[in-house]
Amino acid sequence: MAQSSPKASSRHTPMMRQFLRIKAEHPDILLFYRMGDFYELFYEDAERAAKLLDITLTTRGQSAGEPIPMAGVPVHAVESYLARLVRQGESVAICEQIGDPDNSKGPVERQVVRIVTPGTLTDEALLEERQSNILAALSCHQSRWGLASLELSSGRFSLTEPADEQALAADLERLNPAELLVDEALTLPTGLAVGPGLTRRPPWHFELDTATDLLTEQFGTRDLAGFGAQDHSAGLAAAGALLQYVRETQRSALPHIRRLQVEHGDQAIVIDAASRRNLELERNLSGGTEHTLASVLDSTVNAMGSRLLRRWLNRPLRDRTTLQARHQAVEILMAESLTEALRRQLRGISDVERILARVALGSARPRDLTGLRETLARLPDIQATLTGAGAPRLVDLAAQCGEHPQTLDHLRRALVDQPPVVIRDGGVIAEGYDATLDELRTLSENADNYLLELEQRERERTGISTLKVGYNRVHGYYIEVTRAQADAVPAEYVRRQTLKGVERYILPELKAFEDKVLSAREKALAREKVLYEQLLASLASDLAPLQDTAAALAELDTLAAFAERAQALDYSRPELRDGAGLRIEAGRHPVVEYSLDGPFVPNDLTLDDRRRMLIITGPNMGGKSTYMRQVALITLMAHIGSFVPARAASLGPVDRIFTRIGASDDLAGGRSTFMVEMTETANILHNATAQSLVLMDEIGRGTSTFDGLALAWATAERLARDQRAYTLFATHYFEMTALPEQCPGASNVHLDAVEHGERIVFLHAVKPGPASQSYGLQVAALAGVPGPVLEAAREKLRALEEESSRQRAEPDQLSLFAEPAPPPPLPSAAEQALSEVDPDELSPRQALDLLYRLKALTSGEEGADKKARGDAVDARSR
C-alpha cells in the first residue's frame, strides 16, 4: 500500500476511525466524506482526486502520528466535480452527515447515501441531455453470450444474446455503454472494445438462480415467461447482475424499472461495429458529432425525442408493419399541415422521462416537478391537434399521452410557481396546501414585523440612532451598536459578540423571541421536507401511466422531426416490399448534400435478382464512396421510419448492412492495415446473405498488385455468384471490369470526369460501363503534390504505358486472367518463297514467272484449308 495509506486504525482520532471504517466498505472507489460545507477526501483518495480534478492537495494535521493527505470540494459545486470524475471512468461514494451535530457526543453519524458511477447517473447536471447513458452487463453462460443494458435515467431495461463475438462487438458498439459490468473470472474476446468504464464483479453475481429471484422480485411476478425471457439464461444472468449492482449503488427502491425487453437479432438490421463507424451515424471518423447522419436528421425539439431518434438510428427495424405505420404518420403530419403546430406544442415539454426516474429514486428537485406540471398542462392541446388525424399511429400516441388531471391538480396545489432549486431552504410548498405549514410560516414571517418594532423602540429608549437588530446563523439574533456608543447601552444588554468597530448584544426579551421563532422556522422547514417527500411518494406510486406519456411524447417529437426534415430537405416516402431488390431513383447522400453549398448530383440504383452486383470504377474523388454510402444510408433511413433523400425508393427485405470502406492500422491490437481489411472482409464473406447489403471499397490495395487483384476478384466472385448479396464493389483494378462476363449477376458502372487543359472536373454521375482512366495524376495535382514530382510521375507513366504496349505486341508476361497465347504460326510456302527473293534483282520476265509461281502456291494452300475445314465438320457430325 502507498505511503499515504492509513495504518491500523486503533491509533487514529474518532473521526478518522469513522472515515476508515466507511472507506473499508468502498475500497476501490473515491469516498466524498461530508464535513460541513465541504466533501473531503483523505489519503490515496485525496491524491487521486487532486490529480484528476486539478485541485489542491494539502494535509489535515496528523492521525496515528502521520500527516493526513487531504483534498476537498465545496458542497454547492459538487455536481460539476462529479461530472468530471465520471467522464474519466471514476466512481464516487457520497457519504453524508445524517446525525444532528448538536446532539452528537462523538463524531456526527455519517453513512453512504448513494454511489455515483459512470453507468448509473440520473442527476441532470451529470447527464448529456441528448445522449442515453447506458449501464450494461456481460455474461457467458453455457458457452452463450448474454448482454443486458439499462438506462437508469429512464428505466429502459433489455437483454439480448449475441450469436457470436462479431455480434457481441456490434451490440456493444450500438449501445456504447458508459459502464460495463463483467464477471471478474471472464476472459473477454481479443480486440473487444469496452471503453474506460469496465467494472469487474464477483462470479456469484452472475448466477442464474440469483438473477431470476432478483428479477421476479423487481417485477412482482412468479416467473419471467411474460417477458419472453425464460429461455435466455445467459441474458438473464447478465440482467440479474446488473439489477443487483444498481440496487447497491442507488440504495433505494427502483419502481420505474417495470419491464424487461428481450431483443432478438432478427428483429433489426444487423450493422457490425466497423460498418457502424464507417457510416458515421452519430460520430464521424474523427470522433466528432458534426457531419453525421444524426446531425442531419435530429431536428427534434426536446431531449426525449432526440434520444429516441438515436436509438432508432442505431437499431433499424425489419418489421414492415411498424415502419409503414411510422411512414404513414410522417406523411399525414405533412399532408394535413400538422407538423409545425405539433412541434410548437412539444417545444415546451420537459424531459419527463428523466424527471420520473428521479421521482422514483427520491432525488427529484422542485424544478423537476414544476417541469412535469407544465408538461401535463400541455397535453390537452396536443391531443386536440391530433384529433381526427388520418394516421392510426398518431391517434394511438395521442391516446397514450392521456391528460392526468388529478396529478396536474395535485402539482398545482402543492408547488409555488417558481420554486428554488433545492428543498433545503424551503419556499417550495404553496400556501394553502397544508394548514400546519401555513401556521408555522405565519409565526416565522411575523418575526420581521416584531424585529422592526423592537429596533425602533430600542432606538427611542436608548437614544442610539444607529442601533440595529440583526441575525446570523452562528449567533442568532442580536442588537448591534457602534463601539463609540457602547457606553450608552442599558445595563440589561448582555454582550454577545465584539467585532471591529461594533458591539453586539442580546436582551432577555429578544432571546425568548429567538427561541420561539427559530423553533417555528425549523419546524416549518422540517414540515415542508416531509410534505415534499410525500409528494414524491405519491407520484412514484403512479409512475406507469406517466412513463407511457413520456414515451408517447418522445415518439411524437421524433415523427414530427422526420416530417420537418422531409419537407425542408425534399425527402420522399420509401416503399418497403416483399420482393427482392433495391431500387432508388435520383438518390442523394443526406449528409454530403446537407453540407454542400451547391446542388448535389443525384444517382439511380437498381439491384434485383438478375443484377446483384455493381463493379464501380472511376477516378479518386469521383464519388464512388459517396455513392455507395448513400445507398446504405437511404436503406437505413427507410428502416427507422424516416423519409429518404431520393425521388423514389423501393426496397425489398434487408437483413444486414456491411461496409468495407477505408482502414487504418490497429496498433493496440497488433494488426496492420491489410490485416484489418482482411478481417472485415472475412466477416462479410462468412455472414452475408442474399438479403444483405454489402459495400466493398478498394479490396486488396494493402498488398502487392497481383495478390490484391486476386483477392478482390475472388471476393467479388463469391459475393456475386454464391452469396448473391446486394453488393457495390468499388475498385481501381481495371481487370475487375471483366467479371460481369463470367458472373451474369454483376454489371459495370463508372463515375466519370472530364479534363479541361490542366484542370479536371468530376461529373459525379453514375454511368453504365467501366471507366476509361483513373485520373490519378490530376487528383495528385489537386492535392498539392509538388510540380517536379508530378512531372517525374508523368514520365514514369509514359514509360510504363510504352512498356505495356510493347508487351501487348510481344507478350512475355501473361495477364493474370488471360488465356495462354497460342504459338506463332509457321510461314506458308508462298511466304517462304517470297522471303527468298530480292525484288531489285528481278528482270520483267523473272518477275512475271514469280507471280505465276506464287499464285500456284497460294491456290494449293487454300485447297488444303478447305479440306481441313471439311474434315472438322465431318468429325462434329459423327
UniProtKB/Swiss-Prot annotation:
Molecular function GO terms recorded: ATP binding; ATP-dependent DNA damage sensor activity; damaged DNA binding; mismatched DNA binding
Keywords, sorted A to Z: ATP-binding, DNA damage, DNA repair, DNA-binding, Nucleotide-binding
Entry binding sites for ATP: 618-625
Extent of Basic and acidic residues compositional bias: 800-811, 863-878
SUPFAM superfamilies xref list: DNA repair protein MutS, domain I (SSF55271), DNA repair protein MutS, domain II (SSF53150), DNA repair protein MutS, domain III (SSF48334), P-loop containing nucleoside triphosphate hydrolases (SSF52540)
Classification via CDD domains: ABC_MutS1
Pfam families, per database record: MutS_I, MutS_II, MutS_III, MutS_IV, MutS_V
Keyword Methyltransferase: no
Gene Ontology cellular-component annotations: cytosol
Region: Disordered, residue numbers: 800-842, 859-878
Annotated InterPro entries: DNA_mismatch_repair_MutS, DNA_mismatch_repair_MutS-lik_N, DNA_mismatch_repair_MutS/MSH, DNA_mismatch_repair_MutS_C, DNA_mismatch_repair_MutS_clamp, DNA_mismatch_repair_MutS_core, DNA_mismatch_repair_MutS_N, DNA_mismatch_repair_MutS_sf
GO BP term, pick one: mismatch repair
Record-linked HAMAP family: MutS (MF_00096)
Family listed: Belongs to the DNA mismatch repair MutS family.
Function, in words: This protein is involved in the repair of mismatches in DNA. It is possible that it carries out the mismatch recognition step. This protein has a weak ATPase activity.
Protein name, as recorded: DNA mismatch repair protein MutS
Lineage, broadest ranks: Bacteria, Pseudomonadati, Pseudomonadota, Gammaproteobacteria, Chromatiales
Gene designation per UniProt: mutS
